[in-house]
C-alpha cells in the first residue's frame, strides 16, 4: 500500500481573545489543519496539525517528493526519513508540524488496515483512565481567575495555562497571575 496523495483540510473559526496578535493573523482564521494521507488502495488517514494551511503547504513543497510512492504502512520509517531529508531545510517549525500530521495520519491508516487501535500499535494501554485538563490563556489576574473558575465549574481539576502577559508588564502583575493560578 503506497502513499498516493496528501490533502490539507484547513479548519476555520474564531480564536480566543488574547490568543494571537492580530498582526500575526492578518485576517487569517485557519490556525489548525487536518492532514489527510490517501493511499493507492483508497484507504485514508487523518492527522491534526496546530498550524495554518499556508505554512503546512509550504512544508509539503519540501517533503512531499519523499512521500509519494512510499509505503503507507511504516509510519516510523517514513517520519524518520522525512526528518532526515528535511534536516537542512529548517528542522523544526512548519516542517516538523507537517511531519507530525503525516505521522498521525499514517498511524491512522495502519490502525485501519490492521483492525487495531492505535494505542495497541504504539505499545498498549498503560492506563484505564486519564485525568483531563482545561487549557486556558494566561491573562490579566481577574480574567484568568474567571477562566479558571469556569473550568472548575465544568469539572476540570487541572489546567494548562498558556501564553499571555507573563513577563511583559511588570513583576507585580506576574506575581498576581501566579497567585491567582495557585488559588
Residue ranges and their predicted role:
Residues 59, 74, 78, 98, ...:
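General structural feature for long, well-ordered alpha-helical segments within catalytic domains
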Residues 128-183:
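Metal-dependent enolase-superfamily TIM-barrel catalytic cores that perform enediolate-based chemistry
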Residues 41, 89, 113-137:
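N-terminal small/glycine-rich loop or linker at the start of catalytic domains
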Residues 10, 51, 163:
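Residues that line or immediately flank small-molecule/substrate-binding pockets and catalytic motifs
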Residues 1-47:
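Structured beta-strand/loop patches that form or line metal/cofactor-binding pockets in enzymes
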Residues 38-113:
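Metal- or metallocofactor-binding catalytic centers and their adjacent structured scaffolds
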Residues 26-29, 124-126, 183:
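Solvent-exposed alpha-helices and their adjacent loops that cap or buttress functional pockets
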